[in-house]
Amino acid sequence: MAQTSRSADLTSGPMLQKIILFSIPLAASSILQLLFNAADVVVVGRFAGSTALAAVGSNGSLINLLVNLFVGLSLGANVVAARCFGAKDDHGVQDTVQTSVTLGLVSGVLLAVVGFFAARGLLELMSCPEDVIDLSALYLKIYFIGMPMTMLYNFSSALLRAVGDTKRPLYCLAAAGIINVVLNLVFVIGFSMSVAGVALATIISQTVSACMVTRMLMKEEGALHLDLHHLGFHMGALKQILLIGLPAGLQSTVFSLSNVVIQSAINSFGSTVVAGSSASANLEGFVYTAMNAFSQAAVTFTSQNMGARKYQNLNRVVLNCLLCAIVTGVVLGGGAVLAGTQLLHFYSSDAAVIAAGYERLRVICGTYLLCGIMDTLASSLRGLGYSVLPMVVSLVGSCLLRLVWIATIFQLNRTPFMLYISYPISWVLTAAVHLACLLVVRHKMRQRGQTLKAA
């Protein structure tokens, strides 16, 4: 197969070293994306007040609800491209590239239309506080206008990750992150644009990163080359992307739905708790994305090794990714708990907001390694070709459990803590079932001569 300029063989050599080298730029890229939101939250909280902070921060679960289905499709693009690359199938990689970029643009336009026109109605369904809803709706409408560029970046960077290139997406986001911070300061402080300014800064910076990473694909030689004149859907590639991506996207969407229900319950405690929870959630994101880099590594490494038929590497890949996720969760999650009050000061100087934020932070970050284990096991199953199985397990073990918890246990003791504790409980149960499924799948693969039959 014609190698791309920055591709990497993830099927041979020291796996732990390769996983770490692959994951560090990936984690840094994800953290830079979080810095977009952190810059929004910090600037608006400091210079536009607690109401504006709540307006920006409380939108995360709703944005994820609308976006995650299509982000799941980009995971499908990553798995299919990685498997074709591992199998040295140039034609398959090329079809996946053209189909993925087209799918990214189409899904982005669809999200922009739905998000723009449904923003206020969805916020009302979530019981968004009256003093926040107007600003929240304004932020959402502007944010979703930029969704085509966000989706274009997600799908294009997924293709680069599939061939082992995680550094160049990092460079794109670094440039965009600097632009985002500068524009935040200019729009909010210089022009007093409040939430409209931070939303506008975000979509401009995301447009920059999307254009950069797409340009990289256009300049590629070989199978990863993007030809804008040949954009379109190749049915074989599209079917494979949907088979992997739709279950992952549906899982993420229902996860987000359960989080929307939780956010609605948080909203019932007033704007102070909403602001504190929003600040904590932003900090939690840094711990999660660092762990999630190893979950994404598990998908790409297992997919390439499946394509190359190097089944003997699969157990090493999964164990090494789990080890890295656990260590990251312990170190960063524990550090966030220890320094939580000081970190929350960056988001607000209001003592009540900080106290409300720390109540959430100590529960979530203190147990976040459990989420890392759960996600890595689920990603490993997807990389092996089993996309429906982890979806069903996650929907029942996490989402349904949280909804039942809110309808029963939470009603007996309506406090923020009783909402937050539902997260680690669901992570433990779901991770245990994922582990059992993975052990059964590997046993069946060995029994039938390591021939994969996708669920």
Kindly give the residue locations of the regions a language model identified.
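Short alpha-helical transmembrane segments in multi-pass integral membrane proteins
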Residues: 1-23, 81-146, 179, 190-246, ...
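Transmembrane helical elements of multi-pass membrane transporters/channels
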Residues: 21-40, 142, 176, 205-209, ...
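Residue-level signal for short hydrophobic patches within transmembrane helices
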Residues: 12, 16-35, 39, 62-69, ...
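Small-residue-rich hydrophobic transmembrane alpha-helices
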Residues: 53-113, 150-169, 263, 276-334, ...
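Short runs within selected transmembrane alpha-helices of multi-pass transporters and secretion channels
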Residues: 74, 142-161, 169-177, 198-213, ...
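Alpha-helical transmembrane segments of multi-pass membrane transport proteins
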Residues: 17, 32-33, 70-71, 111, ...
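Helix-terminus/linker motif at the lipid-water interface of multi-pass membrane proteins
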Residues: 31, 35-54, 123-130, 186-195, ...
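Alpha-helical transmembrane segments of multipass membrane proteins
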Residues: 38-42, 113, 121, 155-159, ...
